[in-house]
Swiss-Prot record:
Belongs to the MshB deacetylase family. Coiled coil: none annotated. It is an enzyme of class 3 (hydrolase). The keyword Metal-binding applies. This is 1D-myo-inositol 2-acetamido-2-deoxy-alpha-D-glucopyranoside deacetylase. It comes from the Bacteria. Binds 1 zinc ion per subunit. Its cofactor is Zn(2+).
Amino acid sequence: MRDLIGFKAVAVHAHPDDEAIWTGGLLANLAARGADVTVVTCTLGEEGEVIGEPYQGLTNKNADQLGGFRIHELHKSLSLLGVRGEFLGGAGCWRDSGMIGDPANEHPRAFISSGDKSIEQLTEIFERLQPDLVITYGPDGGYGHPDHIRAHNITHTVAENMDIPRILWAVTPRTELEQGMAAITTLPSGWRRALPGEVACVDHVDLTIALDDHAFAAKAAAMRAHATQLWLADATISDVNPHAAIAGVADPKAAPLVFALSNLIAQPLLDIECYQLGGGTPLTSNDPTEGIR
């Protein structure tokens, strides 16, 4: 159903892979319906760890070339989602700040110190694209990462100055997350279960989007594209990570797939995405475009 031709959506994300993990299903759905969807990525994710042995030398402790490699992963992910992308200020303008207290916080290009310049850059993008819908994280950045919080702050500064019709915050629902974790019966070697409260989630959501087969498959494929950062326990192998992982699941509805970040904490890849209303026109249904088109 191509009912969104002329509709424009912009997602503002901190690092390559966030577009897939947090919003991949919604972005794929909007694009399939004809919307013009753009992902703005604020850094190259230079401070990330690397899953798999072949590209360990790219990390910031070695060649410090991970950011360039992640551009390649991001381009593949965006193509699989059917959306366009651009970097805030151009590729390499802002650097991944790392977690709170990391030495990367002090880098002269650290995104957390981007000041008014990043606001001006995002203003130019929003003025050029004129989005009907903007998607980012909540005030805590979803899980406290400084770059996610900075992405939230600049997005709201610009969107509120421009009177964007609707802003959504991507969140993880507690109930479905816990049900999915409980459904995972066996873990791949080396993986572990999350400790209580270790995976960020929320009790309240305003919008629950059920991902159809296309949107879920696109999201999973986009996540696989970020093989240095994400490991799906579906027997997938790649040149980045040549080791297959397989998880056992008691209830495939609760946990259609299982994945992990570089911390190897097993998480369910849910067949829903949840959002909170961050601003603008109130939601009237589980269609995030209703009331603003």
